[in-house]
Amino acid sequence: MPHPSPHDEHVDSKPATGARAQADRGSCLEVFLVFLRLGLTSFGGPVAHLGYFRTEFVDRRRWLDDYTFSDLVALCQFLPGPASSQVGMAIGLRRAGWAGMLAAWVAFTLPSALALIGFAMGLAHYGWLSGSAAIHGLKVAAVAIVAQAVWGMGRSLCPDRSRAALAVAAALLTVVLPAALAQIGAVVLGAVIGAAFLQLPARPVLSHAPSGVSRAAGVASLVLFAVLMAGLPLWALISSGALAGQIDGFYRAGALVFGGGHVVLPLLETASVSTGMVSSADFLAGYGAAQAMPGPLFTFAAFLGAMSSGPLSGWAGGLLLLCVIFVPGALLLTAALPFWDTLRRRPGVRNMVAGVNASVVGILLGALYDPVWTSAILGKADFGLALLLFALLVYARWSPLWVVLLAAVSGWSLGWLV
């Protein structure tokens, strides 16, 4: 890990406390530069991102203490949206206020978003690439990566029979019912069953650091979230325009995804492929390429916006839909921060979230079958390659970056041999 430069904040040997971390304010530029480096180097998905954040902000810079960091992680796992990005926004907010929150998000998100927009424009300009063997290899990589996510999340979020059964029920819903209805239905099913039947042990509350958000601002954020959630579908219905429908679909995807990361896949597939915005082949190729990027997986929205067949595409479409998908998570974060200390003490809330998390595993399992498997596994060679890539991810613990590169090279090689 690189050592701090002379311009970095002095790192002392004493652990930070929540009060001290709140008092030590920094500049937006400081926040931007630290998160930009993380945005360029944080490979491995949301769980790995949280590890990078803890090393950087708790161990190295001491912007906050371990208890406060754990509380932020717990809150962002509880909320819909991209958990690692929400933790980053919360750290930026605590360090440099509202402008720091924006700086943290922009710096952490921009590197992978720009790279994916560039990849999309390359595919659009050189149309033959979409059907190339190397691009098909990226689709096969997506099978292995989503399977790994289902495997890991299942072990973590479905540790008992009741939650495993709930995940299976959610998977069946996603396969049998229309996509949008199935996903919402599975989340509601998980919330109801979790609140009614699950009994999770209570956890001690250890941190009481100020949130940096007033209750008035929290209520305003929640109201704005609800207005957009209800108003965007009406706008899309009244205008009958493709752009309004895209904004509504991507906002809804950001608002309904629990767990972040790969869980956004079925929601984005509904918002883009099912509406004819992009082809299934381009969708999976972009999803495979996104695995090789640092930073949040939600930047896949930038690829889809750039590839869009609607009124906006290229840089404008990519940047617009990138912003749209992150808005609900940011609003929910600022709405929840001032009330989290009260919410986390309620057993019903913990049980409900546990049920939703189990349903999320089922939603992702359904997406693994359709569209990921059905679009990528076209023969025995594809199945063998997917199995190899899965083993490298799970047992050899390869980085997704190397798995994606191997998949592209293998796909190209198989294209010559078959």
How should each PLM-predicted stretch be described?
Residues M1-L79, A90-M293, L297-V418:
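Multi-pass membrane proteins that catalyze or facilitate reactions on polyprenyl-/lipid-phosphate substrates
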